[in-house]
Amino acid sequence: MAAETASGYIQHHLQNLTYGQLPDGSWGFAHSAAEAKAMGFWAFHVDTLGWSLAMGLLFIWLFRMAAKRATTGVPGGLQNFVEVLVQFVDSSVKDTFHGRNPLIAPLALTIFAWVFLMNSIDLVPVDWIPQIAMAISGDEHLFFRAVPTTDPNATLAMSLSVFALIIIYSIKVKGLGGFLGELTLHPFSSKNIVLQIILIPVNFLLEFVTLIAKPFSLALRLFGNMYAGELVFILIAVMFGAGLLWLSGIAVVLQWAWALIHIFIITLQAFIFMMLTIVYLSMAHEDNH
C-alpha cells in the first residue's frame, strides 16, 4: 500500500475514490482527503456508486435467473433460497404492514437483498479489492472503498428515498389536510379553539422532529454499524502488517472470529433497515394518529 504507517494505512482505507472539480478548475480524481473535501457538494464517490450499482444488478440477475429456472418439480438450490427469502419477506410484511399496497412487499424484498449484498462486500479481505483497483488503474496511491454502506452518502440516499415514500403515501392516504393535521394537532389537543391554536407550534415542533428523525435514524444506524465493522477488519489487517509472528497469529484468530460475527451483523442490519421501512410505511397508511 502507498501508506506506510499504521495511521496512514487506516486513513487510506477510509477514503473514497472521489471525482470532482480540482483546485485548478479541472475535473478529476482527488489524490488526498483535503482535495476531496475541497471539491464540495458536487463530488462523486465513484466507488460507492459503482459497487452499489453492481450489487443492484447482481440482485436483479440472481432473481431473474431463479425465476427463469423455476420449476414445479424438485427445485434447485438457487430456487430454494429465493423461495425461502420471498416467503420470509412476505411474512414480515403481512405481520407488520396493515394497509393495502402491492408495492410494499417487492420494496421490502429489494431493500433486504440489496442492502445485504452491499454489506457482504465487507467480508472480502480489506486489501484485495483496493489492490485490484490499483493494479487496474496503475495508480498505487488510488483511494478505493468497496463497501457502499460504509459511506453515509449511500445510506442517507436510501433513507431519503424511503422518507419520500412516507410523505407521498401519508398525503395520498390521509389527504394534505390530514397529513398537516397530524403535524399540528397532535400530541397535544384541546377543545378550546384558542388553546388549540396556541398548541399548534408546539405540536408541529415535536411531530416535525419525530418525522425528520426517521430517515436520519435509518441512515446512521446502518452506516454506523457497517463503518465500525469495516474499521475492525482494518485494525486486524494492521496487526498482520506489524511483522510480529505472534501478533499475526492472534490476528488470524480475530479475523475469522470477527468474520463469523459480521455475517450475523450484515444480515441483521439489512433486516432492520427493511423492517423499519415497513413500519414507517405502515404508519403512513394509518388514517388515525
From Swiss-Prot:
Source organism: Pseudomonas entomophila (strain L48)
Q: Which GO terms describe its biological process?
A: proton motive force-driven plasma membrane ATP synthesis
- Please explain the role this protein plays, according to its UniProt record: Key component of the proton channel; it plays a direct role in the translocation of protons across the membrane.
SUPFAM superfamilies, per this entry?
Answer: F1F0 ATP synthase subunit A
Topology of this chain in the membrane: Multi-pass membrane protein
Keywords from UniProt, A to Z, are: ATP synthesis, Cell inner membrane, Cell membrane, CF(0), Hydrogen ion transport, Ion transport, Membrane, Transmembrane, Transmembrane helix, Transport
Membrane-spanning parts? 43-63, 104-124, 160-180, 193-213, 232-252, 259-279
Q: How does it assemble?
A: F-type ATPases have 2 components, CF(1) - the catalytic core - and CF(0) - the membrane proton channel. CF(1) has five subunits: alpha(3), beta(3), gamma(1), delta(1), epsilon(1). CF(0) has three main subunits: a(1), b(2) and c(9-12). The alpha and beta chains form an alternating ring which encloses part of the gamma chain. CF(1) is attached to CF(0) by a central stalk formed by the gamma and epsilon chains, while a peripheral stalk is formed by the delta and b chains.
Q: What is this protein called?
A: ATP synthase subunit a
Give the top-rank taxon of the lineage listed in the UniProt record for this protein: Bacteria
Q: Which GO terms describe its molecular function?
A: proton-transporting ATP synthase activity, rotational mechanism
Q: Where in the cell is it found?
A: Cell inner membrane
One Pfam family name from the record? ATP-synt_A
Q: Which gene encodes it?
A: atpB
Major subcellular location class: membrane
Signal sequence annotation: none
InterPro entries, alphabetized: ATP_syn_F0_a_bact/chloroplast, ATP_synth_F0_asu, ATP_synth_F0_asu_AS, F0_ATP_A_sf
Q: Provide the Gene Ontology terms for cellular component.
A: plasma membrane; proton-transporting ATP synthase complex
Provide the family line. Belongs to the ATPase A chain family.
